[in-house]
Amino acid sequence: MDSTRNSASSNSTGCFTDQKKRKALYEVFKKLSGVDCQRNEGNVVEGVTCYYGEMNKEQFHVAIFQTDKNESLFSERVFDLFDTNHDGLLGFEEFARALSVFHPSAPIDDKIDLSFQLYDLKQQGFIERQGVKQLVVATLAASGMSQSDEIVESIIDKTFVQADTKHEGMIDEEEWMDLVFRHPLLLKNMTLQYLKDITTTFPSFVLHSQVEDT
């Protein structure tokens, strides 16, 4: 896995380079962000249609979790990683790059790389126990679940026993990749199934209509 953090820093929109898919994703973006759909829409630069507007963290949380409940550390971390100019907002291209990683057809390496970055809270190049604990607790809370601190610590202990093969008290990128390949369910929350068919149907929380072919 490349340590240059390709999934968040890349300018590629990956699974959303196709114009029909970009337009469909923009419909979701418009609905969630409330952008004026008539303003500056449709400018073409080098054969690519450019879309405009901005989305805040709360709106992005709805895109990730398909609910308007309180945002979580997970969605906040994803948002911050793709907010490349650190203005607290995502433009459409940043939004497309973020959701591209969550597409069912996105390369597994991109999902592994982004998941590592999410747990590496301090961006140090390795995962600490505290980073794992914060995200485990946040993910459970976002799912409407809660566990005692004792059970959470037990989960983290087991994770580090399996992952920290170098016995350094941390998990580096190589160890994380090995762990994920042994336990693919660790990437379950890195895939949003609704994105697979985004050109034919929107998630029900956004729209109840179909995208027309153009």
Curated annotation (Swiss-Prot):
Q: Which PROSITE patterns match?
A: EF_HAND_1, EF_HAND_2
Q: Could you tell me the superkingdom of the organism this chain comes from?
A: Eukaryota
Recorded hits in SUPFAM superfamilies, A to Z, give: EF-hand
**Which amino acids does the record list as binding Ca(2+)?**
83, 85, 87, 94
Which GO CC annotations does the UniProt entry carry?
cytoplasm; nucleus; plasma membrane
Q: The EF-hand domain covers which part of the protein?
A: 33-69, 70-105, 107-142, 151-186
Q: Where in the cell is it found?
A: Cytoplasm; Nucleus
Q: Name one GO biological process term.
A: negative regulation of ATP-dependent activity
Q: Which residues carry this modification: Phosphoserine?
A: 204
Keyword match Repeat:
yes
UniProt keywords, alphabetically: Calcium, Cytoplasm, Metal-binding, Nucleus, Phosphoprotein, Repeat
Q: InterPro entries recorded for this chain?
A: CNBL1-10, EF-hand-dom_pair, EF_Hand_1_Ca_BS, EF_hand_dom
Looking at the UniProt record, the site noted as Involved in dimerization sits at 143
Which GO-annotated molecular functions does the record name?
calcium ion binding; kinase binding
UniProt keyword Repeat, yes or no: yes
Kindly give the Pfam families that the UniProt entry links to this protein. Answer: EF-hand_5 (PF13202), EF-hand_7 (PF13499)
Q: What does this protein do?
A: Acts as a calcium sensor. CBL proteins interact with CIPK serine-threonine protein kinases. Binding of a CBL protein to the regulatory NAF domain of a CIPK protein lead to the activation of the kinase in a calcium-dependent manner.
Identify its protein family.
Belongs to the calcineurin regulatory subunit family.
Subunit composition and interactions = Homodimer. Interacts with PP2CA.
Q: Would you tell me the protein name for this molecule? A: Calcineurin B-like protein 7
Organism in which the protein naturally occurs: Arabidopsis thaliana
